[in-house]
Curated annotation (Swiss-Prot):
Segments traversing the membrane: 182-202, 208-228, 286-306, 321-341, 379-399, 430-450, 499-519, 557-577, 587-607
Protein name: Uncharacterized protein C691.05c
GO terms (BP aspect): chloride transmembrane transport; endoplasmic reticulum-plasma membrane tethering
Taxonomic classification: Eukaryota, Fungi, Dikarya, Ascomycota, Taphrinomycotina
GO cellular component terms, semicolon-separated: cortical endoplasmic reticulum; endoplasmic reticulum; endoplasmic reticulum-plasma membrane contact site; membrane
GO molecular function: chloride channel activity
Subcellular location: Membrane
Pfam families: Anoctamin, Anoctamin_N
The keyword Transcription is annotated on this UniProt entry: no
Protein species of origin: Schizosaccharomyces pombe (strain 972 / ATCC 24843) (Fission yeast)
InterPro entries in the cross-refs: Anoctamin, Anoctamin_N_fung, Anoctamin_TM
Amino acid sequence: MNEKLQSYEKQLTSDIVNNCDLIIEVNASSKTCQETLSSLLRELQLSHFSTAVRPGSDTSIFVFVKVQNDYLIELAHNDRTSSFLCGALDDLNHVNVNSVTDIDSSERIRLVYDKITGSKTEDSLGICPGENPYADIISIFPLHQPKFDIKWSKYWYQLLLGNKKQLDSINAEYGSQVALYFAFADFFKTGVFVLSFWGILGYYFLRPYSYIFAIGVALWGAFFIQFWRVQEHKLTNHWSTVNCQSLAKSMTEFKPQSYRVDSLLGTARPYYPQWEIIVRSTIANVPLFLISGCILLFLIAIAFIVDVTLSEVYSGPLKSIVSLLPAVVFQVLTLPFTFIYSIVAERLTKLENRRTKTDFQASLSGKMFLQNFMLSYTALFLISYIYGPFAEYFVPHYIQNRMSQSFFSVGYIAKSTFKLNPLRLRNQYIYFLTNAQVINYITILAVPQLISYVKKHYMSKPTRELHIQDIPSETVTLKRARSEAEKIEYDCYNDYKDFVLMFGFLVMFSPIYPLAPIFSLVNCVLYIRSSVYRFTKMVKKPVPCRVDSIAPWDQRLSLLSWLGCITMPSICYFYSSTTKPSDKSMVIAAVIGLLSEHLWFLLRMFISSVFPVDKTFFAPAKERQHLLAERSFSIPPVADVPTSTTTAFEEADETLSIYRTAENKKTK
């Protein structure tokens, strides 16, 4: 009888491993690992989660978590009820959950993850990686579904054809955040495709630095933003995520000032005054922006001056090689700066005390975008507004004269009259559209794999001789789990950043080279393909997240479009004329930019009124509550977890003994 019971329990735990919802990775090297495992298993099993413990990597243990079906139905019903009351879900029939088959993969994982990691004040377990009392937890992640990933990788090109079913399947598997990103990528690709025709017309039929071409690009940018907002609203309404941010769970790191009762849901919600968050953000961000901005501007300016000197003034040996030094040195100097900046930015964002993970990521991405903005556009601004108009003045007087008096006076400084390089701005712009994008593309794909390879083969040599014998029925799943645990976590910032920066290159500098949209179109296709590859092969499966927009990236699109209405006409003014700029040129360019900027606001108002975003009708809260009260839903009672409560603890002890045995052998 005992043998049959043990066999049945092993079968149940194998089912948990092979059909788990989440994997919790625990640091096996920690002295408090056993206490963490015991507390974790006890908390999970008391909350209707089935668990199984298995050896992970050389230094970590896996806790496989699967939610009980009856409890999942209850979680889904409660979540959909809240969504209906807040307006995110508009169909009352969808509130009812008859079986687990009514719950797609992304909703299932999101509900389980929110229940486990959410704050205890919001009726969750408060199990957060790296936070006490679960500091030994390394990460919590779901497993990829190989069948879906293989199919997605095979038919990725359907995203380029605007296939809505493909987006719906992505939403069902990865959640609305990922689906909305690919929807935006596809929409941007379509927009750039349209702009490419205007670029061809401008290149072959309009004169260089044409005002007409600049006006066309400005119109395209404004229409693109509004059309995307319309499309975005349609998708979020279709996926029932409108106004879903009001339901977002608080992070465990959030420190509320008080608690307030939610009038709709009737639950206590943690509260922290928005004005205090703004004050904290201002105090933290202003010094960061000023100091980092000055340092970065100084580095870019020095690299720019040295580049002009070596490429256009220096006439010594190995000029073709020496002229490449500024770019190499600049990259070397900015790498540590970027690393330090990202660490400081993340710590300052934590001090802002953001309530939700979405708010935290939005604030952090704002800090990072400032740095990417300067790295991407400052060189073009310097060439457009400093080198082009004034190089014939400051290069002979400040570079040639002073350098000729230094150790370069042996004849390496050209003494002939300096001539402005008319192709410098165009060449720099084409570099950012081609070489820089190729480097970025290779970096996105190659660097993570290189890091994983180095860690696996050189940096993480086994320090223990682990003797692990996996159960045959679990071998495939455990192999996948160990492989995916080594992957990096998905960061949506870099995905949006590439497209938004590309948008900026188009709407701010297109008159420099009208064929730029064609290069951007090729980059779009490559980025979409690389995104699919990274999702399926290179990163951990992201925990599904509900979002109702791509904010704050839509605001950055508007910012770049507004700046473009200043830069494009002023660049056309400086470079369309063959006469040299006069003393009043900068003033005239500023006036042109100011007038264009005012026209941009009028244009945005006009487009918004002609192509408005359809407002979703929300029934009053009391009416929604009344509708729910009239409707009766049959929810099955939550039964006990069908596994022995001692099985997981026994597995934890057995797994820990494997690591302890290996540790003892190593010390002998």
